Amino acid sequence: MNLEKFNSLIELFFYQAEKQDSKSIFLQWLNPNNNKTFTWEETKLNIFKISKIIKENIKEGDRCLLVSENRPEWFVSDLAIMLSGGITVPAYTTYTEDDYKYLIDDCEPTIIIVSNNEMLKKLNATINQKNFIKKVITFDEIEKSHHNLNINNKDKYLDFNFILKNDLSEKDKIQNVNLKRSSAACI
């Protein structure tokens, strides 16, 4: 395979996905408590679905903060951000609330994607103070008792798995990738 012909990681992923058996496993949890797997086709569709939501809420070049441990949803989110024209700002899960506040103040993300309630608790005080954050997407369902999280605007929060249940139109499945080799990429 000649990598010179690919302008971006997302373009390379779509090329590889088209060559694979749609039912072959591409991503899998390494957590022994979760045996969830994702085929190449599911992964591709999930990237389109998350990208659709991101595109509706960002302009090209906007930052999207990604706070998660290594898991399949991280990969899907990173490629969805790239497909949307956003820039992934990855963050360690070991940061403190002050670290996250500094990072959010510095990069001013339009979207924050966060893995679980524990991480969301560290971020939420800052999220509630910042008007530039349009959406927060969570991999794990937000705790039913919102008082623990002090969520001011419930419409700002989206559930990753709920987004994945949505259908896509054919136009949403177009791999319209306007990325160049010089475009920013999180690797």
What does each model-found stretch correspond to?
Residues 95-126:
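Conserved ATP-dependent adenylate/AMP-binding module captured primarily in the ANL superfamily
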Residues 23-25, 156-158, 162-187:
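Conserved pre-ATP/AMP-binding loop-to-beta segment of ANL
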Residues 36-38, 51-95:
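Conserved AMP-binding/adenylate-forming
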Residues 1-11, 30:
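Flexible, non-catalytic linker and terminal segments flanking ANL/adenylate-forming cores
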Residues 13-17, 27, 43, 47, ...:
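Adenylate-forming
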Residues 68, 91-92, 133-142:
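Short beta-strand elements of ligand-binding domains
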Residues 12-39, 144-146:
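AMP-dependent adenylate-forming
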Residues 68-70, 115-116, 140, 183:
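Helix N-cap/beta->alpha junction signal
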